[in-house]
Amino acid sequence: MKETNKWSVRDVITTVLLSAVLIVIQLVVNMVCMANDFVSMVLSVGITMFLCAPVYMLMVSRIGKRFVTLIYMTILGVIFLLMGNWFLLPYYVLVGILCEAILWKEGSCQKPKRLTAAWTVASLLYNGVNLLPIWFFWDTYYDFVLASGMEQSYIDSYVRYYTSPGWLAFILLFTTLMGFLGCMVGSRLIRRHFKKAGVL
């Protein structure tokens, strides 16, 4: 789809709907992974970024305009705000701005390499959802976790994984790699299916 700067009502609706799909995927994966502390703390973000990558690439390619990623990240931040994690709203807005900078050059929304770069960076920075609380907003996060009914064992696991340099390095590398691999799958789906079907 040709990239233009003029937004239509259809573009806005499509962006919001696909952003909602991305957020639902993230929430579902998070809920399923909560059954095991290791999977929840170490693997869940990577799994999320892998599964969301094709949808993200489809959304940005389909709309073909600037600020799609920023809108999605802002909506995501608002969801976290409503859940009580207010500090994640400005954080994800900043992540969205960084991704927009990667995609700013005209025609970038149609280039798999640019989309892959943007989502890979987003995948790395998505870990802020777990890192910011322990680094800067522990009291706010601790109150949120207790109010959500989490057990102390969950909190202890969280602290253990995210204060260990080895585990932290693994989590960051795993999440970034999974986001990248998800984009490889997304690129293939777009090339082999969506373009042939006339979606793009």
What are the language-model segments listed below?
Residues 19-27, 75-83, 122-131:
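Aromatic-anchored segments of alpha-helical transmembrane domains
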Residues 3-7, 62-64, 103-113, 193:
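Membrane-interface helix-boundary motifs at transmembrane edges
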Residues 30-35, 75-103:
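Interfacial aromatic-anchored transmembrane helix boundaries in multi-pass membrane proteins
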Residues 24, 92-131, 183:
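Short helix-perturbing small/polar motifs within transmembrane alpha-helices
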Residues 41, 117-191:
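Membrane-embedded alpha-helical hairpins and interfacial helices in multi-pass inner-membrane proteins
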Residues 12-17, 46-47, 69-74, 89-90, ...:
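Hydrophobic alpha-helical transmembrane segments
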Residues 1-4, 190-200:
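Short, charged juxtamembrane terminal tails flanking transmembrane helices
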Residues 2-71:
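Hydrophobic transmembrane alpha-helices
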